[in-house]
Amino acid sequence: MALWPLLNSGMLVRTGHTVLTWGITLVLFLHDTELRQWEEQGELFLPLTFLLLVLGSLLLYLAVSLMDPGYVTAQPQPQEEPKEEQTAMVPQAIPLRRCRYCLVLQPLRARHCRECRRCVRRYDHHCPWMENCVGERNHPLFVAYLALQLVVLLWGLYLAWSGLQFFQPWGLWLRSTGLLFTTFLLLSFFALVVSLLLASHLYLVARNTTTWEFISSHRIAYLRQRTSNPFDRGPTRNLAHFFCGWPSGPWETLWAEEEEEGSSQVV
C-alpha cells in the first residue's frame, strides 16, 4: 500500500516525458523544418538518425528511471575472505551507522532517500523528473542519458529554428508558426537545464564526489573533519572508475588509504 503512490507518480512522470518527447518530435516533422524537407526530398538518412537518437535517449531515460539505483539490502551478502593486505589497510573504526528510518547498516557514501524510502549506495540525488534516485548503479547511465539528451535537444533546437518564419503578418504567423515557436522555447529551456546538469555532473565525477557530498560535506561524518575529498584519485582515475569500474574496490578502502596518508603526514 505504501509503495502504490510512488509507483503511480512514477508512471505519471514517465508517461509525461514520453508523450512530450514524441510530441515535440512530431511538431518538428509536421512543420516546414529541414527535417520535413529532407523527408520530402527522399533524403532519409538524417531523419532516421534523428529518430534513432530520440529513441535512444528515451530508452536511456526509462532505464535510469526504472532500474535499481543501488538500494542497500538488509541481509548482508556473503563475501569472500578479505586478503591480508586489504585487512591491514582498512581501519577498525570506519564511520558506519545504522539508518534510523529503515534500520539497515549503511555502507560508506550511502544515504536514506525519503521519497524512495530506501537507503541508496553512493547516493547522488533523487531526480523528480525520473521519479527515482541516482546512485551507484545508475549514475553512469544517468550521465550518458544527459549527454545523449543534450545532443537531441541541440539538434531539435536547430531544426525548430530552421522552420520559423518571421516575415509574416502577426495573425498568420501565430497560426502557422506559433506551435513551432513554443516548441523552440521549450527546447531552449530544456537544453539550458540539461547543459548545466551535464557540466555539473562531469565536474563532480572528475572529483569523485556526489551532489549530496558536495552540498552537505560539513554535515557528513566521514567528510566534515577532512580538508580534502578522501575519494579523489585525480580526474583520469576518477572518470575511469566511474564509467568503466576501474580501478575497482570498496569505498572503505579509499577512505582508509586517505586516513593512512593523513596519519603518516601528521607523524
Curated annotation (Swiss-Prot):
Which domain of life does the UniProt lineage start with?
A: Eukaryota
Supply one GO BP term. Answer: gephyrin clustering involved in postsynaptic density assembly
Q: Catalyzes what?
A: L-cysteinyl-[protein] + hexadecanoyl-CoA = S-hexadecanoyl-L-cysteinyl-[protein] + CoA
Membrane topology recorded in Swiss-Prot or TrEMBL: Multi-pass membrane protein
Q: Which top EC class is named for this enzyme in its record?
A: transferase
- Which EC numbers does the record give? 2.3.1.225
* Chain ranges passing through the membrane: 10-30, 44-64, 141-161, 179-199
What protein family does this chain belong to? Belongs to the DHHC palmitoyltransferase family.
The name this protein carries in UniProt is Palmitoyltransferase ZDHHC12
Q: Which organism is it from?
A: Rattus norvegicus
Q: Tell me the gene name.
A: Zdhhc12
